[in-house]
């Protein structure tokens, strides 16, 4: 899917309660990593429940270009034949990641630590996003940046060393992508590569490295033990394995909030990953008074998963602490929508990282709230939403800036607002939730062109 094609406006209108069951798409973080670690393993990796959105398919194509055998066996079922650490080949063409920030940054870590040369590129949105924070530690590990666009952006070309240099690196920002890129580069380093982070970020890379056979230790670090010290022993033999991808909590967030704010709704969301570093939104919504019940907890793909029963609820404003941001960085747009229907003030603190997402997501959320009559202020890196317990006015058109989460968040608003809400383009929703429209329509949601 090209992000340069003509826009596809969508409108959501209020209607009947949402009812039914759904399973959101597979988790994007685990889907990317299953392809990447499958590439770096010896033997075969089989993946069930892969998210077949554009972002992950770009990562799969890059793994194939670097030498892996990649085959789709059926819906969500894939086989990856790995080449092992050090076995990558130079790709014949540019690695085009489209809109995939995660896939591109993680694969920079892979290429940056191996004796291979590759050029990375993407769409207009990806070309605007900073890569310097990834390139800085990689150059310390021996990666050469042969060419780059201004400001360390794609298109850029990397050449990795015969062996990476093991380093100890303190991340300058709470970013699982920086941590993961360094650890992936460290797979081809003789010795221990250590990443120190001031606040714990999502730990899928560490969990999945262990699943594939790497030795990774994680210890609390810093004041109050809020940070983490992650150490990887380099040059392991990774073994292909079977991966069952749980449902993505960041995608589950949209039907979840919709069920909370559309009166009379009662929805069950199946198989959602409950990793403690990914459920900041659920924690926050429970504090706001949401009726969310966890049932049938079980293990899948090295992660705890559960079914969530969600019923329409009266919500109250809360303060969301900055240290929760890493556990819900992708969920703030839809939390802002929930806050628009709550009684009282909701303050979301420390949202600096939202400014370097697919769009300046903080500015995009604020503009969307303004277009739909929601009282709010942006104070530095804080977003404050003033709700009066009634339905948001709605009636506006939201500029998505090619950002799938902005599009879905404001379509959710439209299902419960007093007036329909339009987003200027819904095409990019396919990057993370290809079945969003039919899924919401099956629950009774009125969304269409």
Curated annotation (Swiss-Prot):
Pfam (any one): EPSP_synthase
GO terms of molecular function: 3-phosphoshikimate 1-carboxyvinyltransferase activity
Principal localisation: cytoplasm
Location in the cell: Cytoplasm
EC numbers for this chain: 2.5.1.19
Record pathway: Metabolic intermediate biosynthesis; chorismate biosynthesis; chorismate from D-erythrose 4-phosphate and phosphoenolpyruvate: step 6/7
Protein name: 3-phosphoshikimate 1-carboxyvinyltransferase
Role: Catalyzes the transfer of the enolpyruvyl moiety of phosphoenolpyruvate (PEP) to the 5-hydroxyl of shikimate-3-phosphate (S3P) to produce enolpyruvyl shikimate-3-phosphate and inorganic phosphate.
Organism of this sequence: Methylobacterium radiotolerans (strain ATCC 27329 / DSM 1819 / JCM 2831 / NBRC 15690 / NCIMB 10815 / 0-1)
Active site: 330
Biological processes per GO annotation: amino acid biosynthetic process; aromatic amino acid family biosynthetic process; chorismate biosynthetic process
Highest taxon of the lineage: Bacteria
Substrates-to-products reaction catalysed: 3-phosphoshikimate + phosphoenolpyruvate = 5-O-(1-carboxyvinyl)-3-phosphoshikimate + phosphate
Disordered: annotated span: 1-30
Keyword Transferase among UniProt keywords: yes
Family to which the UniProt record says this protein belongs: Belongs to the EPSP synthase family.
Subunit architecture: Monomer.
Ligand binding (phosphoenolpyruvate): 28, 101, 129, 177, 361, 405
NCBIfam families recorded: aroA
Keywords, in A-Z order: Amino-acid biosynthesis, Aromatic amino acid biosynthesis, Cytoplasm, Transferase
Residues that hold 3-phosphoshikimate according to the record: 28-29, 33, 175, 177, 330, 357
